[in-house]
Amino acid sequence: MIIPGNDPRLKQVCKPFNFDVGYTMEDGSILSAEKLFYMLKEQMIANKGVGLSACQIGIMTRAFVIGNFTDPDSVISVFNPRIVTMNDDTVVYEEGCISYPGLFMKVKRPKEFEVRFSGWDGVAGTTMFKGYTARVFLHELDHLDGITFQSKASRFHLEQATNQLKKMNRIKKHA
């Protein structure tokens, strides 16, 4: 189940994933990195997303997936990401979020950056991300750092998006 945007857990900073012991669930069971990857991938695809963070399904650890929901083989796992270098060039572009259904707003983000992270197999590597993939990656990384979707937008863009969502909801009610 996807956690809605007003859930206070989305404002918490997630703890690093421990590959040696896995993630301990509330019921005491242990979740492996591989199992978490497949859980996230399944939820992302089911919700037609391009990224999903563990905290968005109530698992407060530093992990997410990104990829194209129409191509399951494109989905990659990201565990314990750390930005290495960030380009100063930025671009403003519209974003949405699975935890905020129907809400789209313009957000300013760096065009490219270099990051180090591990896959679900625990193997770490460094990669450069650019363009749309960089935007999705940083959006999911914000979730891990407790930074909410709407806090990244300017006040103007937030008001504009909120008004548009209200208008769409009114139209749906009368349809």
How would you label these PLM feature ranges?
Residues M1-A175:
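Positively charged
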